[in-house]
Amino acid sequence: MPFMILLPDDTDGSSSSDWITAGIGTSSPDTALVDDNGDTSYVKCNDDNEFMIIDFANPSVAEADIESITSVQFLSSGRSSDRRSEALVDIAFQVPSGFEESCSYDAHASSHETINGTAREVKPFGGAVWEYSDLENLEMKCTKDGTEEVYLGYLALKVIYEQAVSADNATFFGANF
């Protein structure tokens, strides 16, 4: 099935100040989280209950080219900076709200661990199927759980969809063969 990846493109300004952007060429969390490059660029936090809200880019596939949306799933990569204890982050859909999952990133000196969320076939609260307009306003909220410092290096959304079938009704009459 075809899929597209939606990357962070902004923060909504309501993030707490304790998520710090670090690394080369980054000035905000959305720029730090767009590629899975380990410790080259990332956001970090070690304060319990601190959060950041990330807005995602609009779909790269036109609405007319999508018959239906099969699922939406977050993809992430991170690590604990403590060599003995994992670091916990709760990742949830902010818009539409719901579907929170806890990610426990392993303790490691430099390697980031990939943790992907559950592929969600329906929207939170109500169970309605995903619509294209839902993809145009997606936000995720990351909340630090505990005080072990976490480095979050990648956050994206994978959207699996059914491709629209275009009918080939263009019959050629009067063609000169």
Describe each model-derived feature in a short phrase:
Residues 4-50:
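Disordered, acidic Ser/Thr/Pro-rich linker "stalks" and the adjacent N-terminal cap
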Residues 44-65, 120-121:
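Short beta-strands within extracellular/lumenal beta-sheet-rich domains
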Residues 57-59, 63-81, 140:
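A short beta-strand element within beta-rich, extracytoplasmic domains
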Residues 65-68, 124-136:
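Short glycine/proline/serine/threonine-rich loop/turn segments at secondary-structure transition edges
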Residues 83-98:
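Short, surface-exposed beta-strand/strand-loop-strand elements in extracellular ectodomains
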Residues 100-129:
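Extracellular carbohydrate recognition and processing domains
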Residues 141-148:
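Short beta-strand-plus-loop segments that form exposed binding edges in beta-rich domains
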